[in-house]
Amino acid sequence: MFLSALFVSLFTFVQFNCENLFDCQHDSLKNDVEFLPDGSYHWTPFRYWRKLNRVGQTIVSCGERNGEVETLAEQDCSISEEAVANWHLPDMVTLCEVENDSVMRDLTKRSLLRTARYEYVVTHSPDERGIDVALMYSPFSFRLINSRAVRIAPIRGMSPTRDLLYASGLIISGDTLHVIVAHLPSRRGGEQHSRPFRRVVAEKICAIADSVRAVSADAKIIVAGDFNDYTTSESVRMVCASGFTDVSAKAVGQNGARATYKYRGEWRSLDHILVSTSMMPDVRSCRVHDARFLLVEDEKYGGVQPRRNYLGPRWRDGFSDHLPLVAEFALDE
């Protein structure tokens, strides 16, 4: 009786702004000259591959929490087949600030993540810098059915921005999971000036969710990404008002991080994971992943801060200026 309820699978979901994951090749249609070997960041093949493996290390460490996993994640080595079989690596990762398909192919097929067998989908946005969003997933826990990029029509004064990424697929419970990946416009020009630009994207997110629910009223939907806004900001409140809960609203780390991003000594929650009402019973936890090797001492303001890749023009051989969010879901098999 109710035998299926006895078998529960842990589904680990990660949201990560990986900070300027560019390749070293010039795209004549994009403003990516800073991230070339002769650009202001001196973005060489060595630094590119170092960055890829840093992103891989971060993702590995977001999986099953034990000392052995974190020890491996600190090392620049590939993941063995045995490790893949015995460790619970993240099932799904949403990524912000990746340049293109080539970068995602290198990350999943040639970096230290290659034996994890992740698959991915990525957008090709009109963003002037050429940065996109991507969804990376394990084919063993998510079977992709459909994916598409959703273009945002700019309003007056708004530069072309990142596409939304919509994907759907089957999870271990047999349900269809719908995912919307977003990277909303920055606060360049000031919060008030740029607020309407983020509102436009939030409206599009709500429209996508409404179209999904028109077909399946109790659809399981996750919205994740860098909103460049807080839980109390208009864009996040708009999405929550359309039937979502910000499960990352109170997420903190275990090693001093109070949010995913730190600016002038203040921790700020710009990254969010929002879950549809129908999926809330599946939520087990949500945390900021602040493994010690992802942090450095904040010498100016005290405490710790993310170990970013660049500080101004100086390469710091770090990871990202954002920390990942990790949400865990308990799914009936």
Where are these regions (language model features)?
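N-terminal, active-site-proximal structural segment of metallo-dependent hydrolase catalytic domains
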Residues: 8-113, 117-133, 202-203, 297, ...
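Active-site glycine-centered loops adjacent to acidic/histidine catalytic or metal-binding residues
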Residues: 17, 183, 225-226, 322
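Catalytic metal-binding/acid-base residues of hydrolase active sites
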Residues: 19, 99, 185, 227-230, ...
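Short, solvent-exposed loop/turn and secondary-structure capping segments
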Residues: 24-28, 105-109, 132, 146-149, ...
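Active-site His/acidic residue clusters
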Residues: 29-32, 172-175, 180-196
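Structured beta-strand-rich core segments of catalytic domains in phosphoester-bond hydrolases
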Residues: 92-184
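Active-site environment of divalent metal-dependent phosphoester hydrolases
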Residues: 100-102, 128-130, 187-189, 228-234, ...
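Metal-dependent phosphoester-hydrolase catalytic domains
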Residues: 159, 207-221, 228-333
